[in-house]
Amino acid sequence: RGLGDVYKRQGETVGLNPYRLSLTFGVSASFLKKLGLESKRPKIFRDLPPFPKEQLQDKYTGGDIVIQACADDEQVAFHAVRNLIRKGRNTITMKWSKSGFAAIGDRKETPRNLFGFKDGTANVTTEKDFDKVVWTDSKDWMKGGSYMALRLVQMHLETWDRTNLQEQENTFGRYKESGAPFGKTNEFDEVDLSKLPVDSHVRLAKEVDRPILRRSYSYSDGINEQTGQFDAGLIFIAFQKDPNSFVKIQTNLGAVDKMNEYITHIGSGLFACFAGVEKGGYLGQALFE
């Protein structure tokens, strides 16, 4: 009995192709401690510190293992995670799960978040940039891996929708339609910080000058029973070779980011993501051996 039996028995992906399915795995500092591997924890790898304005909920914070499944078909991604969890039911307990989405379009445009602004304009794109920003160059088990900073961000859409366009653009420091920074014409034009409001999101993030790779997705979970408003927002995911890059950015955003009027950080985690698997090897081999 092989995986084909599972495929046929569950049936949810019969007739579907892989739709560019990819899986990313990571572990937290608590994972290393629970398995007696704390001596192998890199010095830069520790839980994220508290940040101003966040209202973290225990159910969305921490955890020992993270699995990110991405595919062009949500059912394919869910099927992959479902079967991984099924294999470990006697060993693990699920903490939380969120289904995210991003506008595909023609794949040439930067996707927009639920506020209608382009999200990920300043991402690294070249192999050289990835080596400089994303992949660790450490000599230990994290060689070739990356650190994932994960934040669950609730977006207050009703408040945002009552805000005029100029105020929305001032919040970001970019024009909504084109994505261009203030004072410029095109989305990817170099940002002139002097043209941006001092409390704008882009200016505060750019002041730190610590590039990261954003792989964020929007989410929608129906209605918040307490507020009667949409339970929706952003699954913010950033990869970097040094977690301090994200920490410095988020610290600078701090309490002065105008965006905080429209969002609340409710979940958080930091995970060390393994490098790819060599032929004949297994995930995390360098850590466990």
Question: Model segments located where?
Answer:
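Long, histidine/aromatic-enriched segments associated with O2/redox biology
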Residues: 1, 5-289
